[in-house]
């Protein structure tokens, strides 16, 4: 199983719910076609983080792209950039065995709560 990863993906995501999986599909196409054009074997799986928007291209391209969620809840900086609510946090476990792989997603939603005075 060929795996390629980067903190900064080659493309930016849409931040709207209906564009999140399209982001992963665009990344899969970019990585697959870039490898083919460069005469390299394309990776089976490509993963990236940075944008904190989870997504999965599944089998849209021969390279499967996984856009990973954040590992922490939004900070004040994220809200200055326009975040309106926390996206899922978590990660992915990729298990490889004899040329096959399985993806186990561990994403968690956090409820927004109001602060209360004691």
What are these regions (language model features)?
Residues 96-118:
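A short C-terminal boundary segment appended to hydrolase-like catalytic domains
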Residues 7-12, 108-112:
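A short, sequence-level motif marking secondary-structure junctions
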Residues 2, 9-104:
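Conserved beta-sheet core of the metallophosphoesterase superfamily
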